[in-house]
Amino acid sequence: MIMEIPAIKALSRYAQWVIWKKERDTKIPYNPNNGKKASSTDPLAWGDIDEAQAGLVRYGANGLGFVLTKSDPFVFIDLDHVLDENKRVKCEWARQLLKEIKSYTEISPSGDGLHVVVSGKLPDYIKHKTKFDDGSALEVYESGRYMTITGEVFDGRDDIKELDLSILGEFAEHKIETKNAPVQIESATTLDDEAIIDLMKRKGQWPDAPKDGDDWSSLDMSFANRLAFWCGKDIERMDRIFRQSPLMRQKWDRPTAGSTYGRITLKKACDFVDSVYDPALRNESDCPFEPYNEEGGPRNDKEEKDPLWLYKVLLTKGIEVWFDIKLEKYGIKRNNRVDYIAKSSLQQIVFEIIGKTPKNIAVPTYIGAYEPSKPEKWEEEGIKYINLFKPTPLMKVKPVKEMPEIVKNLLLNLFDYDAKSMGLFINWLAFIYQYKERTGVAWIFMGKQGTGKGLLVDLLKKIFEEHMSSNITDANLDSQFNPYLYNKLIVHLNEVSADNRKSRMLVKNRLKTWITDETLYINRKNMKEVEIKNFCNFIINSNETIPVDIEDSDRRFNVIECNNVLKEQEWWTTESYQEILNNAEGFAKYLAGIKVDRSKVNEVVMSEKKKAIVETTESVLKQIAKALTDRDIEWFLDNGLEGVVEKNIVNDFQWEELQEAITTGVIPNKYLMIIVEQILGDSKTITWIKRNIITPYQVGETTVVKMAGKPIRAIVVG
């Protein structure tokens, strides 16, 4: 298990994970939460390690990745093409480097390279990439890039070590620059040091003495940025003034990477700051940094008059932030997308914008609610809400009456030209598109591969975008976390496996709740459980014979058998796949133009395939009856009975009683109902059990027994 590796545990403390897919010769990072392309500079496109592992399966990615930022301590060293076919290091320079840098090392996805992760500081004179004559290469990064993670530990190096990376400078023969780049000094100021200090104090730019728990390095960097502006990037003057500040300490002169900690900090500030102070221009307002106090906010009257100063700065950048008092997380809306993030992630975003990391961020408080029929913001009973629903571009198109011909061909192929079922599905889909509500009915598409089941999902994904979860598998269903249901109109379950009784029970138990309940309980990693209104509608794709148990009285599922392979159809060409996706807008316009028959939205049809599933499900009743009669406790355990303990339906004492009841053949009614409900996935009354299991299969007869001194009705079997 990858999470058992100490290095991965260390990296997992940071919500900087992505997934990646190999496209041609490039590994492209993707957002693990929505499957869209990610950026190594956008924290909203990342997730925690659990979200990344779930996204890896959900979106069919090739692997995991970790994004390096300025706020984490990690440096990534990539040794490319250094392994032979036996996974031995073949390059002398790489062997020497590995002798010096003993930290977490793993084999790269290609199998011929090594990745080393170190906790440390990369010297600024080290070039990011060095190529060698033998075709190998060395790359080093500490921010603005992502690294692939395989978990294939090399040479037992499974932990991240804190090291002095100035050792990289000893590889000069391998074309790594060891000369410090000249510093560009732009000084327009004629003021002396005391005048600069006085000016900074009056402008609220002078730091206070750090307190216990303060991040000294961040305070150093923030003050150095200000000095770069006020001193015109004159490093000597910046250094003299820094030494007079409350931040000065022994670390400032500590030798680091061929220089000193202080010099490196000042050099970074000069590289970061764009403009400088010029007394002749009186351009004090050009300083890119707000005055700050010990809390990281402005230290002047502005703070008292406008506590939301930082919130407004973010608004000018197209970013709206609020604190959700229900989730206890920060909501952030950017580019018409809403995400919930931790305070640390928000601080990282703020740092990228204003060059400092405030400890406190004053923003409005709301409760985020997904309400398609509500305005962007509203208030009810004194509580302020912000709407998390944002229509996609294809949810705002003008209606038309004709469906694109090629989309019609796809649907006819899927439904085997069954006009009635196809009409019901289109009506169901149009209802979701127009009214954005839960229908209470799910559609199951079964049969051969290559019939267009996945293509239909891809088409709908183009229309609904973030309002649709796709490629949810059994692994997701078996997890305690269910973020894929959060604020979704359509959920696609892919390749649902039901090769055993326990799998079918799991799927049925979950689906029964999700399809019919008015609300859902959402569990996400590192977030409070939250109850939300249920808008979910389900499309299930499966190649299994029985994806889910269905009873004769079922009113939840429509089942379609798909046997027409697309490549065998006369109308299909090599361009048809892309042509169908290109007609997503046309199909959206058609859905917008349909006059929905609300009376048929929940209609289900007993198709031949559904009838076969019902018959198979009914045979399970016989199996339950036989297991009861045989007092076969192992059959019940193999078919998921232990789930009653996991769900806290019974306590440990009751669990022992229940098992004993099965093995002795005297089963109290209350336990019999629990047993049958757990196996079938539906709540059953004792009357139903007698009518459907006991009487037809002659399981036993009703009696009265004493339990804990009290008379209890029971069934005697066997």
UniProtKB/Swiss-Prot annotation:
Residues that bind DNA: 304-718
UniProt-reported outcome of changing residue 251 to D: Much weaker primase activity. No effect on extension activity
Effect on the protein upon substituting residue 78 to A: Complete loss of DNA synthesis activity
Required co-factors: Mg(2+)
Active-site annotation: 78 (for polymerase activity), 80 (for polymerase activity), 115 (for polymerase activity), 139 (for polymerase and primase activities)
Chain intervals for the UniProt region annotation (Primase): 1-292
Result after altering residue 115 to A: Complete loss of DNA synthesis activity
Segments for region (Polymerase): 1-176
Catalytic reaction(s) noted: DNA(n) + a 2'-deoxyribonucleoside 5'-triphosphate = DNA(n+1) + diphosphate; ATP + H2O = ADP + phosphate + H(+)
GO molecular function: ATP binding; helicase activity; hydrolase activity; transferase activity
Region span, Helicase: 404-593
Assembly, per entry: homohexamer.
Domain comment (free text): The N-terminus region is involved in polymerizing DNA and catalyzing de novo DNA synthesis. The helicase region forms a hexameric ring.
Protein name: DNA Primase-polymerase
Gene it is expressed from: 28
